[in-house]
Regions:
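Conserved catalytic/switch belt of AAA+ P-loop NTPases
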Residues: 194-213
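Conserved glycine-centered beta->alpha loop in an early N-terminal alpha/beta scaffold
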Residues: 1-96, 140, 168-169, 173-175, ...
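P-loop NTPase catalytic core of nucleic-acid-dependent motor ATPases
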Residues: 57-156
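AAA+/SF3 P-loop NTPase mechanochemical coupling elements
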Residues: 171, 210-228
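Residues immediately C-terminal
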Residues: 185-186, 233-235
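AAA+/P-loop NTPase substrate/partner-engagement loops
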Residues: 136-191
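Structural recognition of the conserved hydrophobic beta-strand(s) that form the central parallel beta-sheet
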Residues: 181, 223-231, 246-247
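Phosphate-sensing "switch" segment of ASCE/P-loop ATPases
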Residues: 220-222, 237-297
């Protein structure tokens, strides 16, 4: 291209649209990579045969905000070590508390193949400071990317992100859980924002808005399941409570939790478990099993 036009040639007004095809014509056919960019995760289409995830391959580019650290497993991720980490994660608290949350984390990618895309519920992990709810939830989210273990990637409600910002994050996180940390009733607009946020996410999008001309603004669909941590769940709105699985962690009294520590040390391998789950769901056997499960719902 430089030999044909010169490295400092200008692009005239309204001619930029011709630049891409010109580069294509001046590039040898075998040296022209084809890449597709998406701004969300999740199933590529309703056939549910390909799941979009950052790092999945070199020809598919997934651009999502840093704080939703979804990622295909790195080269060193080991499934056996990931399963061991998952076992430690379940045993870190009472299994009757942790098992339902783990099941809820596996649920988002199977809803659309099962035809249950509108049958979503949220998860709220409650507990006082020192119950390790955030540390446990961070580690569990590593099922879908090792970067969730970093505190820098925590999406904090109120003090760290407004309701509208969280809705924007949710629009990128299709068919996956979205961790929202540290809900506090006295931060920001408190329970009012929380109730509206849960309704908006579970109903598939924010309210419709129009422009001054009367035309409707484009709205992005929401297809994630919120997993929220906080000291207590707002009890004033019956409709939102009915759509939330509440799990309460006991205070740990400042004592070390060896199972959680072991899970954290192996957290980089947890994404191998999540990736195996996603790959199985896209197989004929996986799709058949999800549809059979949907019939019993």
């Amino acid at each position: 291209l430089t030999e044909a036009t010169g490295g400092i040639d200008i692009v005239y007004n309204r001619m930029s649209a011709h630049l891409r095809p010109a580069i294509g014509k001046l590039t040898r056919e075998g040296e022209r990579p084809q890449r597709i960019r998406y701004y969300r995760t999740g199933w590529q289409d309703d056939a549910c045969t390909s799941f979009l995830m950052p790092g999945m391959d070199e020809t598919t580019l997934i651009s999502v905000p840093r704080q939703i650290a979804y990622s295909a497993p790195p080269a060193g991720a080991d499934l056996t070590a990931g399963l061991l980490a998952l076992t430690h994660l379940i045993d870190a608290m009472k299994p009757e508390l942790t098992a339902p949350i783990i099941a809820a984390l596996f649920m988002p990618p199977m809803l659309r193949p099962a035809g249950l895309g509108n049958e979503r519920a949220a998860v709220f992990i409650a507990g006082r400071t020192g119950s390790l709810k955030t540390s446990w939830a961070q580690t569990a989210m590593c099922l879908y990317g090792p970067g969730f273990i970093s505190n820098d990637n925590l999406l904090k409600m109120g003090e760290g992100a407004t309701r509208n910002a969280i809705m924007a994050f949710a629009a990128h996180a299709h068919d996956l859980p979205l961790l929202i940390d540290n809900y506090k009733p006295n931060t920001g607009n408190g329970k009012h924002d929380f109730v509206n946020l849960i309704h908006n996410i579970l109903e598939g999008g924010d309210r419709k808005r129009s422009e001054r001309s009367g035309a409707l603004r484009d709205s992005k669909p929401i297809r994630c399941i919120p997993v929220v941590t906080g000291e207590d769940l707002p009890r004033d709105d019956a409709a939102s409570i009915a759509r939330i699985l509440l799990v309460t962690f006991d205070w740990q009294r400042g004592e070390p939790n060896d199972h959680l520590t072991a899970a954290q040390e192996l957290s980089e391998h947890l994404c191998a478990v999540g990736w195996s789950w996603l790959q199985w769901l896209r197989t004929p056997a996986g799709r058949t099993a999800t549809k059979a499960a949907a019939k019993t719902f």
